[in-house]
From Swiss-Prot:
SUPFAM superfamilies for the chain: Cytochrome c
Pfam family, one: Cytochrom_C
GO molecular function, a single term: heme binding
Classification via PANTHER family: CYTOCHROME C (PTHR11961)
Residue list for modification N6,N6,N6-trimethyllysine: 80, 94
Protein name from the UniProt record: Cytochrome c
Cited function: Electron carrier protein. The oxidized form of the cytochrome c heme group can accept an electron from the heme group of the cytochrome c1 subunit of cytochrome reductase. Cytochrome c then transfers this electron to the cytochrome oxidase complex, the final protein carrier in the mitochondrial electron-transport chain.
Effect of residue 4 to S: In 30% of the molecules
Amino acid sequence: ASFBZAPPGBVKSGEKIFKTKCAQCHTVDKGAGHKQGPNLNGLFGRQSGTTPGYSYSAANKNMAVIWGENTLYDYLLNPKKYIPGTKMVFPGLKKPQERADLIAYLKEATA
């Protein structure tokens, strides 16, 4: 199922998901440094593997996907299947509602 068929995302729920499942390795704050994973500020519309100052896997650079609602929705289901060879160890969010909520939060928080 694609993002177009996803339930509406809830920003507050998405923020909770980010804090519990993503914030250990990622930040969304403009100008903040990278953690284990890259800073996600400015994520939407950016090509995978291009955040300045972060050392990406070749897989992430070579994928050359443009991040948006549709690509993130598919990626977050199973990151290792979407980008084989990615350094991201997170197994993914299986529930469509959780992915929609996280994307709603990221869209606001990374802008």
